[in-house]
Amino acid sequence: MKFPAVKVLIISLLITSSLFILSTADSSPCGGKCNVRCSKAGRQDRCLKYCNICCEKCNYCVPSGTYGNKDECPCYRDMKNSKGTSKCP
């Protein structure tokens, strides 16, 4: 008897989280690209922050996919933080 209630709860949580991600989508040219890029990130807030910074500085270029492919955008690939590691997710 409890299993259908658990299934309904899980499905409603999945739908709610999907709607939340869509509602927080940025309307700038970088918003959609960074939402895709950061869709599998563990820390989406941090990923979106740095992706948007890099995207704007690199003339709205964001590599395709959720990881890698940085050769598509050399500016995005070459941007470093103060520690010398890649700034852009």
UniProtKB/Swiss-Prot annotation:
InterPro entries the record matches: GASA
Coiled-coil ranges (or none): none
Key words of the record: Disulfide bond, Gibberellin signaling pathway, Secreted, Signal
Superkingdom in the source lineage: Eukaryota
Tissue: Expressed in vasculature of rosette leaves and roots, cotyledon and root tips and developing seeds.
Subcellular location: Secreted
Gene Ontology BP terms: gibberellic acid mediated signaling pathway
One of the record's GO cellular component terms: cytoplasm
Signal peptide: 1-25
One family name in Pfam for this protein: GASA
UniProt PTM: Six disulfide bonds may be present.
Family (UniProt): Belongs to the GASA family.
Function statement: Gibberellin-regulated protein that may function in hormonal controlled steps of development such as seed germination, flowering and seed maturation.
Name under which the protein is recorded: Gibberellin-regulated protein 10
Species name: Arabidopsis thaliana
Lineage start: Eukaryota, Viridiplantae, Streptophyta, Embryophyta, Tracheophyta
Gene designation: GASA10
